[in-house]
Amino acid sequence: MESGSKMTARLMLAVGGAVLGSLQFGYNTGVINRPQKVIEDFYNHTWLYRYEEPISPATLTTLWSLSVAIFSVGGMIGSFSVGLFVNRFGRRNSMLMSNILAFLAAVLMGFSKMALSFEMLILGRFIIGLYSGLTTGFVPMYVGEVSPTALRGALGTFHQLGIVLGILIAQVFGLDLIMGNDSLWPLLLGFIFVPALLQCIILPFAPESPRFLLINRNEENKAKSVLKKLRGTTDVSSDLQEMKEESRQMMREKKVTIMELFRSPMYRQPILIAIVLQLSQQLSGINAVFYYSTSIFEKSGVEQPVYATIGSGVVNTAFTVVSLFVVERAGRRTLHLIGLAGMAGCAILMTIALTLLDQMPWMSYLSIVAIFGFVAFFEIGPGPIPWFIVAELFSQGPRPAAFAVAGLSNWTSNFIVGMGFQYIAQLCGSYVFIIFTVLLVLFFIFTYFKVPETKGRTFDEIAYRFRQGGASQSDKTPDEFHSLGADSQV
C-alpha cells in the first residue's frame, strides 16, 4: 500500500474512538424492543401507585409509543443541529461535548424505576435521541476528514458497523437471562454510560480533523503535524496541497447556509443525491423485515424465535464487514445498486412466501432465507453508503449544512416508518413488501442515473465536477456524469 494510505495506530485510534458514538446510536435504536413487557409493567405499577387504579390500555399504548418515538424526535432535532457545533468547536471536541447528553440520559433512564417516574425514562429517551442525531453527523464527518482517500470508503463503513454492533449488543443484553428482566432493565437502559465514558477516555488522545485545522482555523502547522501522525509518514505535501486548494475555493464562496444548498445550482444536485440516498436507507423496508422476523420464525417452528432474530443481527454485522472490505474495490455506486436490486428480489420472495404460508407451511423456510438475504443486501449497500457519501459529495464549506439536511431526512423518514408501518401492515398484510419493492426499484433507477462514483477521488475533485456541471448538471448524460469515477474503475 502506498505511503500515506496505510492504516496507522493513530488513525485507528481516531476512527475507533469516534465510532463508539455510532455504537451508542445502534444500541439505543434496538434496546427498547426486547424489554417492552417489563417496562409496560413498570408503567402500570407506577400509575397504580400514583392514582390507585390500573392504567388503561389506551394510555399504556400511548406512553409506550411515546417512549419509542421520542427517540426519533430527539434525533431529528440533534441531526439538524450538527452545524452549530462542528464549525465552532471542531469535529473531535463536538463528539466529546455531546457525551454530556449521554451521561444525563443514562442517569435519567437508569434511575427511573427507583424514582417511580416513567417521565424520567421518556425524557432520557429524548435526550439520547438528541445525542444520536448529533452523532449521525459528527462521526461520518470526522472519519471522512481524517481518512486518506484510498481508505475513506472502508473507514466510512465503520460508522454503520458501529451501529449494527450496537443493535446486536442490545439484542443480546436484552435477553431475559441477562438484563431484559424485571429487576435489571434499568441497568440495560443505563448501560449507555459505559461507551460514553470510554469515548471520553479515548478521544482526547485522537487528533482534531486536519481539514478543520487548516481550512476552518488556518492552522497549517497543526494540520501538518496531525497529518504526519495520521498517515505515518513525513511527506504529507499532497494532502496539504489538496486541502489548500479546497480552502482557496472555499474563500471564493460565500458562507453556505441550508437554504443555499437548495438555491445554488452547484449544490442542488449533490444535496438531492444525499437526501434520496438517506431515504433509500430508511424506506427500503429494513425496519419492516425486523418487525416481521420474530413472527415468521415462530410460524416456521423455531422454538426460541428471539435467538433467530439475534441470528439476523449477526448476519447484519457480518455483511457490514463484507462491505468494509469491498467498498474500495467495487465502488460506492456499484455496491448501492447491488444492495437495492438484491433487496427488491428478496422483498418479492418474502411477499410470495408470506402469501402462501397458510397453504404451504414450508414457505416459512423460504421467508427465513429471504429475511437473511434482505438484511445481507442492505448491509452491502443501503446500510453503510448513505452515511459517508455525504462527506464525499461536499467540500469543507457546505459539508456541515449538508450533514444537517441529510441527517434530518434520515431521522424524519425513520420516524414516519416507525409511526406508520404497523397501520400499513394491518391494511396490506403480507403485501406490504410490494410497497417496499416499488420504492427499492425507484431508488435503483435514481442511483443508476444520478449518483456518481466517488471511489478514489479527493473531496476537491468530486466538488469540482459538480461546480463544473453547475446548473446544466441535470442535462448531462449518465455516461458523462459517471465519468466522475471512470478512471478509477480501470
Curated annotation (Swiss-Prot):
Catalysis: reaction(s): D-glucose(out) = D-glucose(in)
Matching CDD domains: MFS_GLUT_Class1 (cd17431)
Pfam families: Sugar_tr
Predominant localisation class: membrane
GO cellular component terms given for this protein: apical plasma membrane; basolateral plasma membrane; cortical actin cytoskeleton; photoreceptor inner segment; plasma membrane
Residues passing through the membrane, by range: 11-32, 66-86, 90-111, 120-143, 155-175, 185-205, 271-292, 306-327, 334-354, 365-387, 401-421, 429-449
The keyword RNA-binding appears for this protein: no
Domain of life: Eukaryota
Glycosylation sites noted in the Swiss-Prot or TrEMBL record: N44
The protein's name in its UniProt record: Solute carrier family 2, facilitated glucose transporter member 1
Source species of the chain: Gallus gallus (Chicken)
High-level lineage: Eukaryota, Metazoa, Chordata, Craniata, Vertebrata
Primary gene name: SLC2A1
